Amino acid sequence: SPLSDLQHQQLLLRMEYEYEKEEFRRQTETMGIARKVKRGLCWYPVGTGRSFYNSLNQLVIEIERKEDKDIEHVFEFGRPVCFFEQGYDGKIHYFNSICTVSYADEERMVVAVPGAGSLLEIQGAERLGVQLYFDETSYRTMFEALEDVIRAKGNRLAELRDILLSKQPSCWRATYPVRFPWLNSTQEAAVNKVLCAKDVAIVHGPPGTGKTTTLVEAIYETLHRENQVLVCAQSNTA
């Protein structure tokens, strides 16, 4: 059934998420601070500056790197980070709280912390460092999307779920074919098929057969009939 298929997909996604997270943790712990610093994944050592509430009412703290300031880094707004402290014996203690970059430039960062307890822990550390943490944003979005589809009931989302994942037939509207002299006959038929679809239409074919041209024309024609069209792609190439 559609629900069991989606629940199975949830399970597989959870397994992938746990594996990726564990693999990130393993690589992080075995790489060593020096290599992470050279790759721009880590600042160590760092100093702490003032703490305050930003315009989003988030508790934030200023962080400044003390060494290796010429190395480019990958810290940027919205990325998750975690703090750690290196003991005099060389062992690293990672703090439990996950923080978020609020602002970053070449030598300074402003980091949003989850609470006053985390702030005190960061301020109290002697040999403090900060590094990128496993980014759960995309996984969180995927889990939420699957949950929305599973829970859908009596609405358009539920209809599309059952059409795409079960034997419920899709619907088509009767329209007069539109002529497109600048397209070949196959492309013209595909555009008309899209315009007739009430639920879903799939345009497919080998490379170089003009799928992108067909989709562009279908979007253009749809905008004559609808207010807006959402276009999604795995990359920006198309």
Model-predicted regions and their roles:
Residues 3-6, 60, 66-192:
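Pre-ATPase regulatory/linker segments immediately N-terminal to the P-loop/RecA-like helicase/translocase core
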Residues 1-89:
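Accessory interdomain/linker segments of ATP-dependent helicases and helicase-like nucleic-acid enzymes
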Residues 207-209, 214, 218-238:
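Conserved RecA-like ASCE P-loop NTPase motor core of nucleic-acid helicases/translocases
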Residues 186, 197-203, 226-227:
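Pre-Walker A (Motif I) flank of P-loop NTPase domains
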Residues 58, 70, 76-78, 96, ...:
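Eukaryote-biased feature marking scaffold/signaling PDZ-domain proteins and nuclear chromatin regulators
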Residues 68, 88, 116, 201, ...:
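Conserved beta-strand elements of beta-rich interaction domains across eukaryotes
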Residues 20-22, 35, 161-164, 176, ...:
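Domain-wide signal for the mature, well-folded portions of proteins, strongly enriched
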Residues 189-190, 202, 214-217:
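Acidic, Ser/Thr-rich intrinsically disordered and amphipathic helical segments
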